[in-house]
Amino acid sequence: MTAYKPYRHQLRRSLFASTIFPVFLVIIIGLVSFYAIYIWIEHRTIHQHVDESQSSLHHTEKQIQTFITQHNNSFQELDLTNHHDVTATKRELLKLIHQQPATLYYELSGPNQFITNNYEHLNTKNMYLFSTHQLKFKNSTYMLKIYIANTPRLSEIKKDSRQFALIVDQYDNILYANDDRFTIGEKYRPQQFGFMNESVKLNHADHRLIIYKDIHENIEDGITLLIVMAVVLVLLVIFGFISADNMAKRQTKDIETIIQKIYYAKNRHLGTYTPLKNNSELEEINNYIYDLFESNEQLIHSIEHTERRLRDIQLKEIERQFQPHFLFNTMQTIQYLITLSPKLAQTVVQQLSQMLRYSLRTNSHTVELNEELNYIEQYVAIQNIRFDDMIKLHIESSEEARHQTIGKMMLQPLIENAIKHGRDTESLDITIRLTLARQNLHVLVCDNGIGMSSSRLQYVRQSLNNDVFDTKHLGLNHLHNKAMIQYGSHARLHIFSKRNQGTLICYKIPLSRGNVDV
């Protein structure tokens, strides 16, 4: 076997060769651009945080407004001079406060009444007056003030990113701050150097939310060096992997070709043998794929041939079992007619010979529907001789339907079943209605015979699923199994019947094997 250089050696050389130059380039660019990148990242982070904080506060404001709107009617029924109503009001307001993702305090003030959840008597001047609402109660109108002491998002931003939050009014008076360097009530005067900030409008009162950061604390020599080294390392790894990946793509092109051939083999479209472009160990795998594909194709063809033979044998066996049942009854009729009416007996023999010629035709299992209908008419004619013309056959079909191709002997069992199980002392009317719909032939066979009881109908329906060679009831069972063999599960046979009301059989025959419409 020819010795080939391992891929890992080539990838290693590629990794070293492609990272020497990037080392110098990254160091130079990294040192120069570090500060700009850092500033850009911080500005981007602050912008993101101010948007998130604004969204969180707007969401809280909307929830509070929705809650108050929904409970306006409830508040109007409460009398705050009543101790129980005061308790109910506190419970509802606490529910409102606890539903919000922030530390909130409320003050409800009115005539001779003051309610709050500020049990620790915290100074509300250090909080942000978030919203005010007028609430109508049964006895008077009260003013509800809601203060924000803090929010989880602002605390998280302060803890993780060391970015602080301010809320100022339209005149830059500080209304809220979570940094001790700012005093509530004073003017906000942003620093020009060493600080980054981003602001956004908070409400209709022109209050603004400001997120700022003091970057003096982060610019230190040790941290700068670590960041630069980390950036250099990351870039080196990225460049190294890119280089190795490019080399791997060139070296693994034959592997991709083999994978593609496996895909073609899976879908049976591999074609003739084609060697790989590069002479390597992979050629042995390539040879094995073609050998395995050829063996698999031979096995598939053998299985398909065996399945076709099995279907042919089953169809022949079913057709063979149809004939003795009918021949026995017809021969008895001919024997009876030879004595009474030799001419009529001759007619029956001619009709029987035509039917046998049709049913024993072996060159094809399919016929035109018109031929099948002629066969049925001859069949009914012979049965009428036996039963004194008591059977009336009506066929309703378009000319297009009559020229469709179906399996041989696919309709005769339906008529045989109607005569055998529907005939009574009175005349029997049988109607065959044939329609075409969505590449399916729909056959409806309806008779006015004695019908079946519900228990008998259930038994007949269950017998359709019995194996064709295991049941003694050959009529509809044979037809159903024959349809399953010839058309697969796309064929459908449904039986409906009531005692003394006749029987209806609905039969769907696919005109295309690819049709799966039900």
From Swiss-Prot:
First-tier enzyme category under EC: transferase
Residue ranges of every copy of the Histidine kinase domain listed in the record: 297-513
Catalytic activity: ATP + protein L-histidine = ADP + protein N-phospho-L-histidine
EC number: 2.7.13.3
InterPro entries: Bact_2-comp_sensor_kinase, HATPase_C_sf, Sig_transdc_His_kin_internal
Regions that span the bilayer: 20-40, 222-242
GO cellular component, as recorded: plasma membrane
Modification type Phosphohistidine: residues: H325
The protein, known as: Sensor protein kinase HptS
Annotated organism of origin: Staphylococcus aureus (strain MRSA252)
